[in-house]
Amino acid sequence: MHRRTALSVSTALLLAAPLLSACSGEARPGTAAVVGGERITTSALQAQVNDVRAAQNRAGQAAAELIASTPNLERQKLDSILQSRIIDEMARTAGLTATQKDIEDERKAYVDENGGAEQFEALLLQKGAMAPGQVDRFLRDRVLLTKLSAKYGNGKLEEPARAAVQALDIEVNPRYGAWDAKQIKLGVGETPWITQRTRPEQAPAGA
């Protein structure tokens, strides 16, 4: 199997330890989360949700199934935003960057190995609830995670991830769920956090 064929959005990365925790306080009006002192607004989160719903609605006969499969889309998209911010902080601390060429090379590899750009985007929508306009962020994360793994070693990102979480001092609006330290997933409750995504499989031939 090629390394990009099974699309892994998330990073076994951070999140293999119940040691990671997040702050949860009183919800600030219009704020989904605060990361490193920067607000993630509910309007920005809703814009991402709307983009995904619009893409799902363009999926023809598959639209209803795609929508039904993402009942907690707000939580899922906030989770994705938080993961990306942590990856950015890890990369910043490590002195690593993702150039536009890096991102385009990553895109080409995924597109080539998944039967073309349309199939690649359809796979991300189906398995990762990502709209076409969100693909670049996915690719950037993949580039940075590859570089982080090269620097620290495969399976050794827990410590830099924990340091990034501490540095960012994340606060999350309780309406979006709770971080379950044992299950390492975002669930219903008071303390939302980052969830590990299911690894999407390659689309069937001819899909």
Located regions from the model:
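Short linear loop/turn motifs
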Residues: 103-108, 138-139, 174-181
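Proteostasis/folding factors centered on peptidyl-prolyl cis-trans isomerases
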Residues: 119-150, 154, 192-207
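Hydrophobic membrane-targeting alpha-helices
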Residues: 17-22, 90, 147, 151
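Acidic/polar surface patches and capping/hinge elements
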Residues: 150-176
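N-terminal targeting/tethering segments
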Residues: 25-127
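Short, low-structural-confidence N-terminal segments
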Residues: 1-69, 166-207
